[in-house]
């Protein structure tokens, strides 16, 4: 076997196993949680045109600025439409690619560690085979650990996978840049040779692409500084540290721009609002606890959840054993590794990578209501995984040094490794099943966090989608007992009441939601719908207009406003709103049908026929559209076509008296014409 190809075979092996284990995710559906706003109802990604690219790059959407992620979702939609299989397939392929890159990057870094270490350094136990062992173990851990399921099985977390891809490629290109330089201390190199090295520029480009995918990549400049310190050993003095920092200036500038845009984007949806209510001291304690908890979940991946609620303020104090132990652990471990770094730097370097890559999402700048999230560990986990890989290689080296029992030790090591792969694969499959759909996901959330409002709200939404209204109401009430000022829960409870035709209660809930969150466009639209059902049309129109002032691209509000205008006999205004709705959502059969009905009233029969046909192209079994099309044909005296449509209506709705009556009229006219 060609020795140069072995790393690629190993990487492909780890990647293929990862891909195979994740295949059951292809059966998963979208989930309402973010998949809705990222893909399902995101009309912008439905067209790959100049308007889409302008949208992707020019503003903040869903509290984020990550244009490359939007482009990725748009490409998926262009190929797969709203078939979740294709979107999940892309995620799985990206994760498998990242696993492939992890193996190759680990081999490259370990080889450079060995090349640049002193003869008596710890890296001397790493020969070619042991480097492959360390990299292979790291890659399998990265690919199969259930902590990463959230990033892969959740379509909306495409940003993790894309960011990870370009993050890894940037480090790999930077390592090539280091290899291209003469193996000398940094202070002896000219700046020009550093900044105009092709690999350096490639690394910078990949970093920018990572930022355009997810701003969590902002930590990369510090990671590169850390690599310069160890294992590249380019930083040997304060001057070389300064020069290394100067070399990273383009990265730092890009990171600062991305960070600024991210904070601005998060503020548009109030995601950073929690900062004002959680004291910095409490956030620091929760962050310290998260550092420890994440390591625990790497070591023993049980109790994983898609939502870890933020602790209540009175629970977060230094006298609490949980937080005191966490602070002692983080500070103590850091101190021990700093002392140990005089002889052995690899542990501090790996710990530093873990801390640095977690800091942007650890909660010091609090975003959202979660204390931690599995998805945040997608890149930081590499540090601990690589250490585990090195331990496996060290055990193999010790086995090689034994005069007797070497085969036994190696056999036990292989057996443990196989058992680990099987166990991780099983745990990953279990987590993939949790992400099957809204119901399985929210049920798991409630089971693991019964005292948090968001899981109950999500379960209520899942019940609402299944039309299990009493159970939905129960869950929304449970959420509001835990968080009475939760506007989203009030809005969803209003939706459940509206479906039960309890309109007064629905109106009350929508009004409560709007008192808590005045810029809640969905609540305005839902309140308008409730008013419309109560025949309070002026109030309904007012609410739909309020929703559209907040969200001009809100297709459903345009549609609802069109219906309200139609009921008020304001036909031209109704036409305007239906057309506006269809520009945003051209595949809405209801809007085509209702627009056609308005055209019928205006005696614009050709336009009416066009709209009814458009509705039926989208929804062929829509009996109302068939009936309306038949009526339009009847008015045009196109009797055979009208007969065909009314017969189709009766096949779909055999007891439709109006269709039967119109069919008889058609037959009578045909007799008269003969």
Question: What are these regions, as identified by a protein language model?
Answer:
Residues 1-495, 522, 526, 560, ...:
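Polytopic membrane enzymes that build or remodel cell-surface glycoconjugates and lipids
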Residues 444, 448-451, 485, 519, ...:
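Short coil loop/turn residues that delineate tetratricopeptide repeat
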Residues 454-465, 488-499, 511, 522-533, ...:
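Conserved alpha-helical positions within TPR/SEL1-like repeat arrays
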Residues 643, 647, 655-674:
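Terminal, low-structured helical/coil segments at or just beyond the last alpha-helical repeat
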């Amino acid at each position: 076997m060609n020795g140069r190809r072995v790393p690629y075979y190993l990487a492909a092996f780890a990647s293929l196993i990862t891909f195979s284990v994740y295949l059951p995710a292809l059966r998963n559906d979208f989930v309402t949680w973010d998949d809705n706003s990222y893909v399902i109802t995101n009309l912008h990604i439905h067209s790959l045109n100049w308007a889409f690219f302008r949208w992707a790059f020019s503003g903040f959407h869903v509290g984020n600025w990550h244009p490359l992620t939007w482009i990725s979702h748009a490409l998926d939609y262009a190929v797969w439409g709203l078939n979740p299989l294709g979107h999940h397939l892309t995620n799985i392929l990206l994760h498998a690619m990242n696993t492939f890159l992890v193996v190759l990057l680990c081999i490259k870094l370990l080889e450079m560690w060995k090349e640049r270490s002193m003869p008596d350094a710890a890296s001397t136990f790493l020969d070619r085979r042991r480097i492959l062992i360390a990299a292979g173990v790291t890659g399998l851990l990265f690919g199969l650990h259930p902590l990463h399921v959230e990033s892969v099985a959740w379509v909306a977390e495409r940003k993790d996978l894309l960011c990870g891809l370009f993050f890894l490629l940037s480090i790999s290109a930077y390592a090539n840049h280091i290899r291209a330089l003469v193996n000398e201390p940094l202070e002896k190199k000219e700046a020009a040779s550093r900044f105009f090295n092709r690999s350096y520029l490639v690394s910078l480009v990949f970093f920018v692409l990572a930022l355009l995918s997810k701003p969590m990549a902002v930590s990369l400049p510090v990671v590169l500084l850390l690599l310069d310190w160890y294992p590249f050993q380019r930083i040997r003095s304060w001057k070389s540290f300064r020069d290394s920092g100067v070399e990273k200036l383009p990265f730092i500038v890009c990171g600062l721009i991305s960070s600024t845009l991210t904070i601005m984007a998060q503020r548009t949806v109030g995601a950073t609002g929690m900062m004002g209510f959680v004291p910095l001291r409490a956030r620091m304690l929760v962050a310290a606890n998260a550092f420890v908890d994440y390591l625990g979940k790497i070591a023993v991946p049980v109790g994983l959840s898609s939502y870890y609620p933020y602790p209540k303020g009175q629970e977060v104090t230094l006298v609490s054993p949980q937080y005191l132990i966490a602070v002692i652990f983080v500070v103590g471990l850091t101190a021990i590794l700093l002392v140990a770094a005089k002889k052995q730097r690899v542990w501090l370097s790996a710990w530093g990578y873990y801390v640095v890559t977690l800091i942007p999402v650890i909660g010091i700048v609090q975003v959202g209501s979660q204390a931690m999230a599995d998805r945040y560990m997608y890149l930081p986990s590499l540090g601990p995984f690589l250490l585990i890989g090195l331990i496996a290689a060290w055990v193999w080296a010790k086995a090689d040094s034994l005069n007797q029992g070497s085969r036994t030790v190696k056999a036990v090591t292989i057996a443990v490794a196989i058992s680990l792969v099987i166990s991780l694969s099983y745990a990953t499959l279990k987590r993939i099943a949790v992400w099957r759909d809204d119901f399985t996901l929210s049920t798991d959330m409630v089971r693991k966090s019964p005292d948090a409002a968001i899981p109950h709200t999500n379960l209520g939404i899942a019940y609402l989608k299944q039309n299990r209204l009493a159970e939905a109401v129960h869950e929304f009430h449970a959420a509001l007992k835990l968080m009475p000022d939760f506007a989203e829960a009030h809005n969803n409870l209003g939706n459940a009441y509206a479906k039960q035709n309890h309109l007064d209660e629905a109106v009350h809930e929508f009004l409560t939601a709007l008192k808590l969150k005045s810029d809640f466009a969905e609540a305005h639209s839902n309140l308008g719908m409730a008013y419309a059902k109560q025949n309070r049309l002026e109030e309904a129109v007012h609410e739909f207009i309020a929703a559209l002032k907040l969200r001009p691209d809100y297709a459903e509000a345009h549609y609802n406003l069109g219906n309200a205008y139609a009921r008020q006999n304001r036909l031209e205004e109704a036409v305007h709103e239906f057309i506006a709705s269809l520009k945003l959502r051209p595949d809405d059969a209801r809007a085509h049908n209702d627009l056609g009905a308005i055209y019928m009233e205006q005696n614009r029969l050709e336009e009416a026929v066009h709209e009814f046909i458009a509705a039926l192209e989208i929804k062929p079994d829509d009996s109302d559209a068939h009936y309306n099309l038949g009526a339009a044909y009847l008015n045009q005296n196109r009797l055979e076509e009208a007969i065909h449509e009314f017969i189709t209506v009766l096949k779909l709705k055999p007891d439709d008296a109006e269709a039967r009556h119109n069919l008889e009229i058609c037959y009578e006219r045909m007799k008269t014409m003969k």
